[in-house]
A protein has these predicted regions:
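Conserved, well-structured functional cores that handle cations and Mg-NTP chemistry
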Residues: 2, 7-10, 17-181
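Nuclease catalytic cores that cleave nucleic-acid phosphodiester bonds
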Residues: 140-218, 222-231
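Short, conserved beta-strand edge motifs with alternating hydrophobic and charged residues
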Residues: 194-196, 286-288, 310, 314
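An anionic, glycine-rich sequence signature occurring as long contiguous blocks
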Residues: 198-302
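Short amphipathic alpha-helical "interface-anchor" segments enriched in bulky aromatics
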Residues: 291-323
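Short coil/turn segments at secondary-structure boundaries
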Residues: 93-96, 221-224, 311-317
Length: 323
């Protein structure tokens, strides 16, 4: 908490006159703590400050080394504070804090795109899509790029890779990121990757499908998992082959050998049973990776959907981006 408070204290204060009753770092401290507790509106922040008034003042006294004698700030106070806040300065402060946490808890970076369906497009070319780099370990967005069309996602992924530090980290991207240039960039920056393969890479997909057959059964490592909750039972079976390029002479690869630092290939079979509807669905997907640990790949593929379940859900439902 000391670290985030010190960084929030660097945000410039735009307020003037009688609007300076409450220090800006105190208002930001309440807002940050409130958001982490599920409070999202100005009225929510006022309520949160009232509910935890003594604790917040004691925390502020410990962090800022000064005491507050005022009553709790109103919703108008929070509104005025944030209306004039420099978004770039606030974003830079947040990134500074995020990087300190990222060095400790970062390793898995999920990259995924999202359409902001609730935006009112005054211009057909206005930016209504985002591509985000999300740190699964701390449930926070590391960086994002806004684009006007979903077809520009590939370039947006490349742009993200230019600005984020991927060294020593593992990147998971869906099929849109399975491009030779993207893999080359990840490897050149000393990162690892797990990428989904679909029909946008037909040659690679065909060669992957040909490997998971009885001919290679002795080479296949199987990792299984089961989860139950929300009225569903999901089973996952990951079949993995390590160092597939050792079969290059017999297979005469045309596509598989173009992926830099390829160490493993994977077939994931997911079965989901809906207890209420009594319906079972089956999905098969393929992946390429620079990792050689099947259990780790299985876990990271599962964790990749944290960007959908945690980030996108919050943006859509709590912040109303799809309204």
């Amino acid at each position: 908490m000391e670290n985030i408070f010190q960084i929030l204290s660097t945000v410039p204060d735009h307020r003037r006159g009688n609007h300076l009753i409450y220090p800006i770092d105190y208002l930001l401290l309440i807002s940050f703590s409130g958001i982490m507790s599920g409070f999202t509106t100005w009225s929510d922040f006022e309520l949160y400050a009232q509910l935890h008034e003594e604790d917040l003042k004691m925390l502020y006294k410990r962090l800022a080394k000064r005491e507050l004698m005022n009553y709790t700030p109103s919703h108008d106070t929070f509104s005025y504070c944030f209306r004039g806040l420099d978004p770039k300065a606030f974003q830079e402060a947040f990134k500074s804090w995020l990087l300190t946490v990222y060095e400790i808890l970062g390793e898995h970076i999920c990259i995924d795109g999202k359409t902001i369906r609730g935006v009112r497009k005054l211009d057909p070319d206005s930016d209504s899509h985002t591509v985000t780099a999300y740190i699964a370990g701390i449930r926070a967005s590391l960086n994002q790029v806004f684009i006007s069309k979903k077809s520009n996602e590939i370039n947006a992924v490349k742009e993200l890779l230019d600005v984020i530090d991927v060294e020593g980290n593992i990147l998971t991207i869906d099929a849109i990121g399975t491009q030779k240039e993207i893999v080359d960039k990840i490897v050149s920056k000393k990162g690892e990757y797990i990428l989904q393969v679909k029909s946008n890479q037909p040659g690679t997909l065909l060669e992957l499908e040909e490997h998971f057959c009885s001919f290679y059964k002795d080479e296949i490592i199987t990792t299984e998992g089961l989860e139950s909750g929300h009225g569903r039972v999901e089973t996952r079976k990951l079949e993995s082959i390590m160092n597939p390029l050792r079969f290059a002479e017999t297979e005469k690869y045309r596509d598989l050998n173009k992926w830099a630092n390829l160490q493993s290939i994977h077939k994931l079979t997911s079965s989901r049973y809906d207890k209420k509807k009594k319906v079972e669905s089956l999905q098969v997907s393929y992946y390429i990776s620079s990792l050689s640990n099947a259990e780790k790949v299985c876990k990271l593929i599962r964790n990749h959907w944290a960007i959908e379940n945690n980030l996108h859900y919050c943006l859509d439902v709590i912040l109303g981006e799809d309204r």
